[in-house]
Amino acid sequence: MAALGRPFSGLPLSGSADFLQSPPAFAGRAFPPGAAGHDLAPRPGVRGPPSSPDGRTARGRVSIHCRKKHKRLAEDDECPVRKKRLTEAELGAVADEWVLGTHQGIEGHGVNTCPGGLSVPSILDAVCEEMDQTTGEPQCEVARRRLQEIEDRIIDEDEEVESDRNVSHLPSLVLSDTMKTGLKREFDEVFTKKMIESMSRPSMELVLWKPLPELLSEKPKPSSNPKNYMGESQTKHTATGTAFPQRTEVLLEPQCTDTPLYHSLETAASTEEEMEL
């Protein structure tokens, strides 16, 4: 308590300002409380100047890289050995197949190896164009083959349907015995066979019918007495002549009865006119 307010006897007054400043090796960084001497010692590593920002960025990059490396090592340690071997073998096989396929494709299509004068993009473009041409032709052939297969299948199905059809399913015409005998009498035998064959086809439907002689006579029956026929016609004419004048008389009678009514109306109208005068 007595030392407050007066300088300490063990230290010179001239070095008080230097004593309060931090050492140059740890400038810009405060020491945490309770730090020991071995913690305060400088660590080996890439460091910039004490006051430059490049040194801080370098330290940050190194720390991030170390963290990522430790994380990868931890993940690899956690993965089982058998799984590691399987994945490595699969990746190696895929890479080998890809390399072999590219070499075989280049040799098969006749593309020369990369000379010194040509660039890699030009060779890749040429290989892609040749692959497009070779893949386009088989696609057309495959499409034509498929169309031909479909057409053949349709034709085969139609033939199978026609072969499966039975004659019993088709419409047929059954001729009676009387019709057959009538056709044989009037027509030739060959013609009747052709007609029957044509009628048995499904595209034609024809029915032939001939009436029997009892139903329809070939000649009209003559009248028994022509004189009676003339007399009957004359009586019909006279009957119509007598009926016609009777009708005319009936039509004229109402006209005769209507005339006195008109006369009476005319006389009544004349008397009214005289009275008005």
UniProtKB/Swiss-Prot annotation:
The modification Omega-N-methylarginine is found at R47. Residues 22-69, 216-242, 255-277 are annotated as: Disordered. Residues 58-69 have a biased composition (Basic residues). The modification Phosphoserine is found at S52. The keyword Coiled coil applies. The keyword Kinase does not apply. Residues 23-55 have a biased composition (Low complexity). Keywords: Coiled coil, Cytoplasm, Cytoskeleton, Methylation, Nucleus, Phosphoprotein. GO terms for biological process: positive regulation of cell population proliferation; positive regulation of DNA repair. Interacts with CIAO2B; the interaction is direct. Interacts with MMS19; the interaction is indirect. Facilitates DNA repair, cell cycle progression, and cell proliferation through its interaction with CIAO2B. This is Coiled-coil domain-containing protein 117. The gene is Ccdc117.
